[in-house]
From Swiss-Prot:
The lineage of its organism: Viruses, Viruses incertae sedis, Naldaviricetes, Lefavirales, Baculoviridae. InterPro entries: DUF325 (IPR003225). Pfam families: DUF325. This is Uncharacterized 17.6 kDa protein in CTL-LEF2 intergenic region.
Amino acid sequence: MKLTYKMASLLKYALRLTREYKENIIPHFDHLTRLRDLIDGMIKSEDVQRFNRTNRNDLISACMQINVRTYMPNATIDMRKQPNCIYFRICQYCHLEADVPSPDDHSVYRYLCVACGTPLVIDHPLDVFGHTEEGVNELLEVQRVNAGGEL
């Protein structure tokens, strides 16, 4: 695929935003959240128009995807290293429903909302509510939604 001038400009722009942070772009939710916050804090409203994006979140998502593809193209998330979080396919920021993922897909891309770039994780229900009936019910509800169930 040949890069157009606009695509090349967006690529340079996205990488320039994060050049001071690039050593910290790793497949960990805290780092991905900080990366999104960094990008969000540096984008100006005129940048959204300049790159012909539909809104600010669309530009943030594009910048997140560019940075992930550049600095960790084949990276995966190891959930064992982040036991206090659980994948949830409903974005907590923009409320978009992600597609139902393959159970063995742990790529970083799966864990990012395509609309706004927010990591698709929540605090583990058993950590929040404990091993109570409420905690177990919340965990079962998350698993049901992740499997494609209705909200």
